[in-house]
A protein has these predicted regions:
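Hydrophobic membrane-insertion alpha-helices, especially the h-region
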Residues: 20-35
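Hydrophobic single-pass membrane-insertion segments
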Residues: 33-44
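Charged, low-complexity intrinsically disordered segments
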Residues: 12-14, 77-78, 82-84
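Primarily the internal scaffold of c-type cytochrome electron-transfer domains
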Residues: 48-76, 83, 98-173, 180-185, ...
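A short, surface-exposed interaction/processing loop segment used at functional sites
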Residues: 191-223
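N-terminal Sec-pathway targeting helices
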Residues: 7-24
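Local sequence-structure signature of Cys/Sec-based thiol-disulfide redox active-site neighborhoods
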Residues: 80-97
Length: 425
């Protein structure tokens, strides 16, 4: 018969052992911390309200503890949650079918997409590109429904070495001017590939910033700031779009800059529209119509993406405490970000970069004479793509909505075609 120590003796020995005392102390501290964490989690992480969200402090996940909800785990992508107040854009089509269908042809709606056989504008027959500065060869390959970038070098005998193949997960850019290509890691990170399709020249080339011997290769990280203007807001966990959070994205991303980037969240509007007891005025008031906003707020809807002081420096600075996806149409853009300009010695009228259209608008006589009534929407219909063949007549008609024919001081003449400077380097 096996003999053992009495229970009382065992307990006395445990309390007498310093190592046991230390173990018990750690357990007690852990229990207290867990209770404190559970009791204060809502207080520390609840998003603040109002136009100026305060800094949110959130304890980091403890070693061995529960992970932050929605955070990427090894081998997993972030678990998406529905963005509050937003709905899939196709729900807008139930009442606005004509506008919805027309908008699908506009560049903004096609700014981000999956590679698809029905959406090919590239030349995959003439798919080879050699980049002299880095001495690397590239081939863009289509394998059924899959797009692949192949990169390699040649040895002294002309044989391929250092071969890398990377499948393409996403296309960024509408293709009006160019298209770039991204791949997504299991952790949810997005990286840009070096090769771009340039539509105007119908050719492959290096992406902007890659035309040098020591470029980023396949390691250029796509940040939330990049995605802000290239896509609709993704479905991410609250707080995951703030400063210091990793730039990770769910697998199921929106495809294109949708209706709600300009009109605001549409869930409440749709819910009220489906209730026959709700007055029409209340339904209309539940969605933002930029054309009915005060002039500065109206312009801010466009300026959130179409105003950048310079691409050479960090000129768009989001206010600390604001998430990347926290701007809503109808809010002052200055509450969300700050535009930092620089003085290079030239008059502003002589400067023009990719997103300087608002500067030119504010310099125009029409804008000044109308006290700001002239806006982007005066000439541009964001729901419609104007084809090159109809552009001259279309924009002439827009001018004539304000100007009579006898107001013209110059003889009508054709427009001289110009090409934009090559900014790929």
């Amino acid at each position: 018969m096996k003999r053992g120590l009495p229970r009382a003796s065992t307990a006395r020995n445990l309390w007498a052992d310093p190592r046991s005392l230390g173990l018990v102390a750690l357990v007690v501290i852990a229990l207290i911390w867990i209770r404190f964490d559970a009791a204060t989690a809502d207080t520390l992480t609840r998003p603040p309200t109002g136009p100026f969200p305060a800094l949110v402090f959130k304890p980091e996940p403890r070693l061995g503890g529960q992970p932050t909800p929605g955070a990427a785990q090894p081998g997993q992508l972030p678990r998406p949650t529905t963005a509050e107040g937003y709905v899939p854009d196709r729900q807008c089509a139930a009442c606005h079918r004509q506008l919805y269908n027309s908008y699908q042809h506009v560049g903004m709606a096609r700014s981000f997409s999956r590679p698809r056989p029905d959406n090919i504008i590239e030349d995959f027959e003439n798919n080879h590109y050699f980049h002299g500065p880095s001495k690397r060869h590239y081939e863009m390959i289509r394998r059924d429904d899959t797009f692949v970038m192949k990169r390699y070098q040649l040895d002294d005998t002309g044989q391929p070495i250092n071969v890398l193949e990377q499948e393409i997960d996403w296309i960024i850019g509408s293709g009006l001017h160019s298209r770039g290509y991204l791949y997504q890691t299991q952790a949810g990170e997005l990286y840009q590939l070096p090769i771009v399709w340039y539509t105007q020249s119908q050719s492959w080339g290096m992406a902007p910033g890659y035309d040098n011997p020591r470029h980023d290769g396949v390691t250029r990280l796509i940040t939330r700031e990049c995605m802000f203007c290239h896509n609709a807001y993704p479905q991410v966990s609250p707080g995951s779009d703030r400063y210091g959070q990793p730039h990770v994205f769910p697998r199921d991303l929106p495809q294109g800059t949708g209706c709600q980037r300009c009109h605001g969240p549409g869930a409440a509007h749709i819910r009220l529209a489906n209730d026959l007891n709700v007055p029409v005025a209340e339904v209309v008031a539940a969605i933002v119509n930029p054309a009915r906003l005060a002039a500065p707020l109206r312009d801010d809807v466009c300026f959130q993406c179409h105003l950048q002081p310079t691409s050479k420096l960090t000129s768009l600075v989001r206010r600390f405490g604001r998430g990347d996806y926290s701007y809503r149409p109808g809010q002052p853009l200055s509450d969300y970000l700050v535009h930092l300009d620089f003085d290079d010695g030239r008059d502003r009228s002589d400067r023009f970069e990719i997103n300087h259209h608002p500067y030119r608008l504010h310099q125009s006589t029409c804008y000044k004479a109308s006290d700001g009534a002239l806006s982007c929407l005066t000439c541009h219909d964001p729901h419609r793509k104007v084809t090159p063949t109809e552009a001259a007549a279309y924009y002439r008609a827009r001018c004539l909505t304000c100007h009579a024919l006898d107001d013209c001081a110059r003889v009508e003449m054709g427009i001289v075609s110009t090409s934009r400077p090559d900014r790929r380097g």
